[in-house]
Amino acid sequence: MQQLQNIIETAFERRAEITPANADTITREAVNQVIALLDSGALRVAEKIDGQWVTHQWLKKAVLLSFRINDNQVIEGAESRYFDKVPMKFANYDEARFQKEGFRVVPPAAVRQGAFIARNTVLMPSYVNIGAYVDEGTMVDTWATVGSCAQIGKNVHLSGGVGIGGVLEPLQANPTIIEDNCFIGARSEIVEGVIVEEGSVISMGVYIGQSTKIYDRETGEVHYGRVPAGSVVVSGNLPSKDGKYSLYCAVIVKKVDAKTRGKVGINELLRTID
């Protein structure tokens, strides 16, 4: 694996010179191997190690290099045709392979090659970008978007129209992460490498980026870039220092544990916020 990483790192340093016409065989094979490993879930752009999320920047570099070495090509797609550098993940799937991998794909859901989809996942008409990782038992609902390199945990529900931000550039940026057993309400947006920790519930229409204040009304604490585990979050406002105006924020209205979540439905958690 180290040799593969070295090839990617070296090629990335001269990426401006690389074109589909002049890409050397070693680089091309290395990039294609990484994309295949991402596609199968053998590698992932970010993973939790000793309780901390670690981003493997060299894998992002490989994804970016894939855009340099590949030319646009016509892509067949049922009622339409497309023209892009990245093939579709399911282009060569037959019924046997779908059965073996054990997930459902509802037309016209689109998944790019280099994204991993785990067993028992359901993809309604949605979009999953290259480098993304969608773990077991997750529902990606209608018109939801999973951005490039985003990491989605087990048993997550991404409701209709949810946007999970992608991150290929800037290179140092970390991917957006939704941990296990989270619920993201309809039309919410989680972007810019924000981490929603395990068991959290995000209400409908909540927008969270790195600069969004995440206010815990029980403690008065303000978080940035991270929703603590077990949080129930709704959209809200905080007053300015001079009291003349208010600015948007996300509000943690309560904390719940796994036992409570098991007994109480998502709708009840969101409706009883007083």
Swiss-Prot record:
GO CC field: cytoplasm
Matches recorded under SUPFAM superfamilies: Trimeric LpxA-like enzymes (SSF51161)
Gene3D superfamilies named among the record's database cross-references: Hexapeptide repeat proteins, Tetrahydrodipicolinate-N-succinyltransferase, N-terminal domain
Keywords for this protein: Acyltransferase, Amino-acid biosynthesis, Cytoplasm, Diaminopimelate biosynthesis, Lysine biosynthesis, Repeat, Transferase
Catalytic activity from the UniProt record: (S)-2,3,4,5-tetrahydrodipicolinate + succinyl-CoA + H2O = (S)-2-succinylamino-6-oxoheptanedioate + CoA
Annotated pathway: Amino-acid biosynthesis; L-lysine biosynthesis via DAP pathway; LL-2,6-diaminopimelate from (S)-tetrahydrodipicolinate (succinylase route): step 1/3
Highest classification ranks of the organism: Bacteria, Pseudomonadati, Pseudomonadota, Gammaproteobacteria, Enterobacterales
Protein known as: 2,3,4,5-tetrahydropyridine-2,6-dicarboxylate N-succinyltransferase
Entry keyword annotation includes Acyltransferase: yes
Family: Belongs to the transferase hexapeptide repeat family.
Keyword Cytoplasm: yes
Originating species: Shigella dysenteriae serotype 1 (strain Sd197)
